[in-house]
Amino acid sequence: MAQQGSGYQARYKRILLKLSGEALMGSEEFGIDPKVLDRMALEVGQLVGIGVQVGLVIGGGNLFRGEALSKAGMDRVTGDHMGMLATVMNALAMRDALERANISAIVMSAISMVGVTDHYDRRKAMRHLNSKDVVIFAAGTGNPFFTTDSAACLRAIEIDADVVLKATKVDGVYTADPFKDPHAEKFDHLTYDEVLDRKLGVMDLTAICLCRDHKMPLRVFNMNKPGALLNIVHGGAEGTLIEEVQQ
Protein backbone atom coordinates (compact mmCIF):
# COMPACT_ATOMS: atom_id res chain seq x y z
CA MET A 1 0.00 0.00 0.00
CA ALA A 2 1.05 3.57 -0.60
CA GLN A 3 2.99 5.27 2.11
CA GLN A 4 1.62 8.28 3.90
CA GLY A 5 2.51 11.44 1.99
CA SER A 6 4.36 14.18 3.79
CA GLY A 7 4.53 17.82 2.88
CA TYR A 8 1.57 17.60 0.51
CA GLN A 9 -1.94 18.87 1.03
CA ALA A 10 -4.57 17.12 -1.06
CA ARG A 11 -6.86 19.52 -2.91
CA TYR A 12 -9.74 17.04 -2.80
CA LYS A 13 -10.96 15.16 0.24
CA ARG A 14 -13.33 12.82 -1.60
CA ILE A 15 -13.30 11.87 -5.28
CA LEU A 16 -15.33 9.71 -7.64
CA LEU A 17 -13.04 7.99 -10.13
CA LYS A 18 -14.69 6.70 -13.32
CA LEU A 19 -12.78 4.01 -15.19
CA SER A 20 -13.89 2.60 -18.52
CA GLY A 21 -14.09 -1.15 -18.84
CA GLU A 22 -11.80 -0.86 -21.84
CA ALA A 23 -9.10 0.57 -19.57
CA LEU A 24 -8.89 -2.79 -17.82
CA MET A 25 -8.08 -4.61 -21.06
CA GLY A 26 -4.60 -3.14 -21.33
CA SER A 27 -3.08 -4.43 -24.54
CA GLU A 28 -5.61 -7.25 -24.77
CA GLU A 29 -8.64 -7.20 -27.07
CA PHE A 30 -11.05 -8.52 -24.46
CA GLY A 31 -11.34 -9.13 -20.74
CA ILE A 32 -9.15 -7.98 -17.87
CA ASP A 33 -5.38 -7.54 -17.78
CA PRO A 34 -4.18 -8.33 -14.21
CA LYS A 35 -1.17 -6.02 -14.64
CA VAL A 36 -3.47 -3.08 -15.38
CA LEU A 37 -5.59 -3.91 -12.33
CA ASP A 38 -2.53 -4.02 -10.10
CA ARG A 39 -1.22 -0.69 -11.43
CA MET A 40 -4.57 1.02 -10.92
CA ALA A 41 -4.85 -0.45 -7.43
CA LEU A 42 -1.47 1.01 -6.50
CA GLU A 43 -2.43 4.44 -7.88
CA VAL A 44 -5.67 4.40 -5.88
CA GLY A 45 -3.67 3.24 -2.86
CA GLN A 46 -1.48 6.34 -3.14
CA LEU A 47 -4.58 8.49 -2.74
CA VAL A 48 -5.81 6.51 0.25
CA GLY A 49 -2.33 6.87 1.74
CA ILE A 50 -2.61 10.68 1.81
CA GLY A 51 -6.11 10.61 3.27
CA VAL A 52 -8.24 10.96 0.13
CA GLN A 53 -11.58 9.12 0.16
CA VAL A 54 -12.13 7.23 -3.09
CA GLY A 55 -15.33 6.07 -4.78
CA LEU A 56 -14.97 4.05 -7.98
CA VAL A 57 -17.28 3.35 -10.90
CA ILE A 58 -16.06 0.97 -13.61
CA GLY A 59 -17.72 0.42 -16.98
CA GLY A 60 -18.28 -2.99 -18.50
CA GLY A 61 -17.33 -2.47 -22.13
CA ASN A 62 -14.36 -4.83 -21.91
CA LEU A 63 -16.77 -7.71 -21.29
CA PHE A 64 -20.12 -6.75 -22.78
CA ARG A 65 -21.92 -3.92 -24.57
CA GLY A 66 -25.70 -4.08 -24.44
CA GLU A 67 -26.24 -1.24 -26.90
CA ALA A 68 -24.33 -3.03 -29.65
CA LEU A 69 -26.33 -6.23 -29.27
CA SER A 70 -29.61 -4.30 -29.13
CA LYS A 71 -28.84 -3.06 -32.65
CA ALA A 72 -28.49 -6.70 -33.68
CA GLY A 73 -31.96 -7.49 -32.36
CA MET A 74 -31.54 -8.19 -28.64
CA ASP A 75 -34.02 -6.52 -26.32
CA ARG A 76 -32.34 -3.32 -25.06
CA VAL A 77 -33.38 -3.83 -21.46
CA THR A 78 -31.99 -7.37 -21.45
CA GLY A 79 -28.76 -6.14 -22.99
CA ASP A 80 -28.40 -3.35 -20.45
CA HIS A 81 -28.97 -5.78 -17.58
CA MET A 82 -26.21 -7.98 -18.98
CA GLY A 83 -23.98 -4.91 -19.19
CA MET A 84 -24.67 -4.16 -15.53
CA LEU A 85 -23.51 -7.66 -14.62
CA ALA A 86 -20.29 -7.02 -16.56
CA THR A 87 -19.61 -3.98 -14.36
CA VAL A 88 -20.05 -6.18 -11.28
CA MET A 89 -17.43 -8.59 -12.63
CA ASN A 90 -15.00 -5.70 -13.14
CA ALA A 91 -15.77 -4.34 -9.68
CA LEU A 92 -15.02 -7.70 -8.06
CA ALA A 93 -11.73 -7.91 -9.96
CA MET A 94 -10.77 -4.41 -8.81
CA ARG A 95 -11.69 -5.17 -5.21
CA ASP A 96 -9.48 -8.25 -5.33
CA ALA A 97 -6.56 -6.21 -6.71
CA LEU A 98 -7.01 -3.56 -4.01
CA GLU A 99 -7.18 -6.11 -1.22
CA ARG A 100 -4.04 -7.85 -2.52
CA ALA A 101 -2.36 -4.46 -2.16
CA ASN A 102 -3.64 -4.27 1.45
CA ILE A 103 -6.18 -1.59 0.59
CA SER A 104 -9.59 -2.08 2.20
CA ALA A 105 -12.39 -2.06 -0.39
CA ILE A 106 -16.07 -2.88 -0.70
CA VAL A 107 -18.31 -3.45 -3.73
CA MET A 108 -21.82 -1.98 -3.57
CA SER A 109 -24.16 -3.02 -6.36
CA ALA A 110 -27.29 -1.21 -7.51
CA ILE A 111 -28.73 -4.68 -8.18
CA SER A 112 -29.12 -6.94 -5.16
CA MET A 113 -26.61 -9.80 -5.31
CA VAL A 114 -26.69 -11.36 -1.85
CA GLY A 115 -23.51 -13.23 -1.05
CA VAL A 116 -21.57 -11.59 -3.89
CA THR A 117 -21.68 -7.84 -3.19
CA ASP A 118 -23.27 -5.46 -0.73
CA HIS A 119 -26.42 -3.73 -1.95
CA TYR A 120 -25.98 0.00 -2.57
CA ASP A 121 -26.91 2.10 0.44
CA ARG A 122 -25.82 5.74 0.48
CA ARG A 123 -25.45 6.04 4.25
CA LYS A 124 -23.44 2.82 4.44
CA ALA A 125 -21.26 3.99 1.55
CA MET A 126 -20.55 7.26 3.36
CA ARG A 127 -19.55 5.39 6.52
CA HIS A 128 -17.14 3.22 4.54
CA LEU A 129 -15.63 6.27 2.83
CA ASN A 130 -15.15 7.99 6.18
CA SER A 131 -13.41 4.81 7.39
CA LYS A 132 -10.95 5.12 4.46
CA ASP A 133 -12.37 2.14 2.56
CA VAL A 134 -12.44 2.36 -1.23
CA VAL A 135 -16.08 2.01 -2.29
CA ILE A 136 -16.66 0.48 -5.73
CA PHE A 137 -20.13 1.22 -7.09
CA ALA A 138 -21.29 -1.51 -9.49
CA ALA A 139 -24.26 -2.23 -11.78
CA GLY A 140 -24.61 1.37 -12.92
CA THR A 141 -27.75 3.06 -11.63
CA GLY A 142 -29.57 -0.28 -11.60
CA ASN A 143 -31.79 0.92 -14.43
CA PRO A 144 -31.56 0.28 -18.18
CA PHE A 145 -30.91 3.15 -20.62
CA PHE A 146 -28.49 4.84 -18.20
CA THR A 147 -24.75 4.75 -18.87
CA THR A 148 -22.03 4.12 -16.32
CA ASP A 149 -20.96 7.74 -16.89
CA SER A 150 -24.39 8.82 -15.64
CA ALA A 151 -24.03 6.39 -12.73
CA ALA A 152 -20.65 7.89 -11.85
CA CYS A 153 -22.03 11.43 -11.79
CA LEU A 154 -25.08 10.33 -9.80
CA ARG A 155 -22.99 8.52 -7.17
CA ALA A 156 -20.59 11.48 -6.96
CA ILE A 157 -23.49 13.79 -6.18
CA GLU A 158 -24.98 11.36 -3.68
CA ILE A 159 -21.75 10.90 -1.72
CA ASP A 160 -20.88 14.63 -1.83
CA ALA A 161 -17.68 14.06 -3.79
CA ASP A 162 -15.52 17.08 -4.55
CA VAL A 163 -14.94 16.10 -8.17
CA VAL A 164 -15.59 13.43 -10.80
CA LEU A 165 -12.36 12.21 -12.40
CA LYS A 166 -12.93 10.45 -15.72
CA ALA A 167 -9.97 8.34 -16.78
CA THR A 168 -9.55 7.97 -20.54
CA LYS A 169 -6.90 7.04 -23.12
CA VAL A 170 -6.19 10.69 -23.99
CA ASP A 171 -5.03 13.58 -21.82
CA GLY A 172 -8.23 15.60 -21.87
CA VAL A 173 -10.96 16.86 -24.20
CA TYR A 174 -10.11 17.80 -27.78
CA THR A 175 -11.88 19.57 -30.63
CA ALA A 176 -11.81 16.23 -32.48
CA ASP A 177 -10.53 12.70 -31.95
CA PRO A 178 -6.75 13.21 -31.57
CA PHE A 179 -6.11 9.67 -32.81
CA LYS A 180 -7.83 10.50 -36.11
CA ASP A 181 -7.17 14.23 -36.49
CA PRO A 182 -3.56 15.37 -35.97
CA HIS A 183 -4.78 18.99 -35.89
CA ALA A 184 -7.17 18.40 -32.97
CA GLU A 185 -6.69 20.97 -30.23
CA LYS A 186 -6.93 20.28 -26.52
CA PHE A 187 -9.09 22.28 -24.12
CA ASP A 188 -7.67 23.08 -20.68
CA HIS A 189 -10.99 24.41 -19.33
CA LEU A 190 -14.60 24.13 -20.45
CA THR A 191 -18.01 24.92 -19.02
CA TYR A 192 -20.80 22.34 -19.04
CA ASP A 193 -22.74 24.39 -21.58
CA GLU A 194 -19.71 24.57 -23.88
CA VAL A 195 -19.45 20.78 -23.80
CA LEU A 196 -23.13 20.50 -24.69
CA ASP A 197 -23.12 23.24 -27.34
CA ARG A 198 -20.01 21.89 -29.07
CA LYS A 199 -21.25 18.28 -28.79
CA LEU A 200 -17.82 17.21 -27.62
CA GLY A 201 -18.92 13.76 -26.51
CA VAL A 202 -17.13 13.83 -23.15
CA MET A 203 -20.04 12.05 -21.52
CA ASP A 204 -23.65 11.48 -22.45
CA LEU A 205 -26.19 14.29 -22.11
CA THR A 206 -27.68 12.94 -18.87
CA ALA A 207 -24.29 12.77 -17.15
CA ILE A 208 -23.23 16.28 -18.18
CA CYS A 209 -26.59 17.76 -17.18
CA LEU A 210 -26.39 16.05 -13.78
CA CYS A 211 -22.98 17.61 -13.16
CA ARG A 212 -24.14 21.01 -14.39
CA ASP A 213 -27.32 21.05 -12.32
CA HIS A 214 -25.45 20.06 -9.15
CA LYS A 215 -22.28 22.07 -9.84
CA MET A 216 -20.12 18.94 -9.78
CA PRO A 217 -16.68 19.59 -11.34
CA LEU A 218 -15.50 17.03 -13.87
CA ARG A 219 -11.92 16.42 -14.95
CA VAL A 220 -11.00 14.24 -17.92
CA PHE A 221 -7.44 12.89 -17.87
CA ASN A 222 -5.15 10.16 -19.16
CA MET A 223 -5.00 7.28 -16.69
CA ASN A 224 -2.09 5.75 -18.61
CA LYS A 225 0.17 8.65 -17.62
CA PRO A 226 2.09 7.62 -14.49
CA GLY A 227 1.34 9.86 -11.52
CA ALA A 228 -1.46 11.79 -13.25
CA LEU A 229 -4.09 10.80 -10.70
CA LEU A 230 -1.94 11.78 -7.73
CA ASN A 231 -1.00 15.05 -9.43
CA ILE A 232 -4.68 15.94 -9.91
CA VAL A 233 -5.47 15.32 -6.26
CA HIS A 234 -2.57 17.60 -5.31
CA GLY A 235 -4.04 20.34 -7.49
CA GLY A 236 -2.16 19.70 -10.73
CA ALA A 237 -3.69 20.75 -14.04
CA GLU A 238 -3.89 17.37 -15.76
CA GLY A 239 -6.25 16.94 -18.69
CA THR A 240 -9.35 19.12 -19.04
CA LEU A 241 -11.41 20.63 -16.22
CA ILE A 242 -15.14 21.07 -16.84
CA GLU A 243 -17.01 23.25 -14.37
CA GLU A 244 -19.69 25.91 -14.11
CA VAL A 245 -17.43 28.94 -14.43
CA GLN A 246 -13.83 28.94 -15.56
CA GLN A 247 -11.49 29.91 -12.76
From Swiss-Prot:
InterPro entries, A to Z: AceGlu_kinase-like_sf, Asp/Glu/Uridylate_kinase, Uridylate_kinase, Uridylate_kinase_bac
Record bears the keyword Kinase: yes
GO biological process: 'de novo' CTP biosynthetic process; UDP biosynthetic process
UniProt-listed CDD domains: AAK_UMPK-PyrH-Ec (cd04254)
Swiss-Prot/TrEMBL catalytic activity: UMP + ATP = UDP + ADP
Biological pathway: Pyrimidine metabolism; CTP biosynthesis via de novo pathway; UDP from UMP (UMPK route): step 1/1
Broad class of where this protein is predominantly found: cytoplasm
A single MF term (Gene Ontology): UMP kinase activity
Assembly notes: Homohexamer.
Family: Belongs to the UMP kinase family.
PANTHER family: URIDYLATE KINASE, URIDYLATE KINASE PUMPKIN, CHLOROPLASTIC
Functional summary from the UniProt entry: Catalyzes the reversible phosphorylation of UMP to UDP.
Protein name: Uridylate kinase
Origin species: Pseudomonas fluorescens (strain Pf0-1)
